[in-house]
A protein has these predicted regions:
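N-terminal active-site segment of His-dependent metallophosphoesterases
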Residues: 1-63, 131-137
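Active-site metal-binding loops of divalent metal-dependent hydrolases
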Residues: 6-10, 49-52, 81-83, 122-124, ...
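Metal-dependent catalytic neighborhoods of phosphoester/phosphodiester hydrolases
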Residues: 14-16, 48-67, 84-103, 153-159, ...
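Accessory, non-catalytic peripheral segments of nucleic-acid enzymes
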Residues: 39, 207-318
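Short, conserved loop/helix-junction motifs that constitute active-site signature segments
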Residues: 68-72, 134-135, 159-166, 236
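Active-site regions of enzymes building and remodeling cell-envelope glycoconjugates
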Residues: 75, 105-107, 117-119, 137-141, ...
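Conserved catalytic scaffold of divalent metal-dependent phosphoesterases
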Residues: 76, 83-161, 189
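Conserved beta-sheet core of the metallophosphoesterase superfamily
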Residues: 151-213
Length: 318
């Protein structure tokens, strides 16, 4: 049984994501990977690229090596586009020796690799001329390639080039639902951006006959909610939730910054056009703006104009 995961995107210090929460989630993920290996009698774990989100920091490397040292089953890691340093090069080349010396069960693959009736095409080789066509005598391929998500996301290579394989197991697209043609994506096990609702994340189990099934992880996620009051901004224990506070300018002026606040959103009911008469006073122009553009109620408009008038008189007296 082969376990296939991809797109871990180990990253610390992301905006609005507390580092302790992120570290805790990665460690929980590592444990769930081990649980899946034990439960399903997995003999090989393949990690299909974008294990890192970028060239890793020291703290991100610490998480990586914590995972590597505890690996108990044969594991193959190959690179994705986020590990690329330039075309046809990956920083995994620099991690290969230390990774394999730390735990001989873990192999880092940075060049096209063959085993029995399957092969691995790392991202560093994907864009070499003839890289796909030159892979012969295998029916199954592991790689990292962007597929299509209409209408905006287009494939990075002609996907018909993969038609020679019975199944291609690939990293890159973050949702299993983006599986297409003969290309199967496990999706990212962890949400890497904030979502409005909880999404399903998981992994692939590949049997000896190359049939596969998709299974879910149960991990905390990054969520964004829209509220109209700071009283609705409740800190959540499992998921990490941030909030957009929606209201008019007057309401939002009293909202203080906090770790739970993502942004303030001015809510407007109409797309009004401001029409000003040349005979209007500044107070009248301000009243029109507050009423028809910012859509404040009459009491708030009167209060703001009163403050403006008082300050104007003081300025004229100085």
């Amino acid at each position: 049984m082969i376990l296939f995961t991809a797109d871990w995107h180990i990253k610390l210090g992301q905006k609005n994501v507390p580092i302790p929460w992120a570290c805790s989630r990665y460690k929980l993920f590592f444990q769930q990977v081990q649980d899946a290996i034990d439960k399903h009698d997995v003999s090989l774990h393949i990690i299909g690229g974008d294990l890192f989100d970028r060239v890793p920091s020291m703290d991100e490397l610490t998480l990586y090596f914590d995972f590597v040292k505890d690996v108990s089953v044969d594991t193959i890691i190959f690179d994705g586009n986020h590990e690329a340093t330039k075309k046809n090069h990956t920083f995994f080349t620099n991690l290969k020796r230390v990774t394999e010396e730390l735990n001989p069960k873990v192999k880092v693959i940075t060049e096209t690799f063959y085993l029995h009736d399957w092969a691995i095409l790392p991202y560093a080789d994907l864009h070499r001329k003839g890289s796909i066509e030159d892979i012969d005598d295998v029916d199954y391929l592991f790689t990292h390639v962007r597929g299509e998500i209409p209408p905006h996301v287009t494939p990075e290579v002609d996907l018909e080039r993969f038609d020679k394989f019975k199944i291609v197991f690939a990293g890159d697209l973050h949702a299993h639902e983006n599986t297409q043609r003969n290309i199967v994506y496990p999706g990212s096990p962890m949400t890497t951006s904030f979502h409005r609702n909880v999404v399903k994340t998981g992994y692939l189990l590949i049997d000896d006959d190359w049939s596969w099934t998709w299974h879910e992880f149960d991990l905390p996620q990054l969520l964004r909610k829209t509220v109209t009051s700071t009283e609705e901004m409740v800190q959540t224990e499992w998921h990490h939730t941030i909030y957009e506070v929606e209201g008019d300018v007057s309401d939002l002026s009293g909202v203080k910054n906090s770790d739970l606040l993502d942004k303030k959103v001015i809510k407007r009911k109409t797309e009004a056009t401001l029409i000003l008469d040349k005979e209007m006073t500044m107070e009248e122009e301000l009243g029109e703006y507050l009423s028809y553009i910012l859509e404040l109620d009459e009491d708030k408009v009167k209060k703001i104009i009163g403050v403006f008038s008082d300050n104007s008189r003081k300025a004229n007296m100085e």
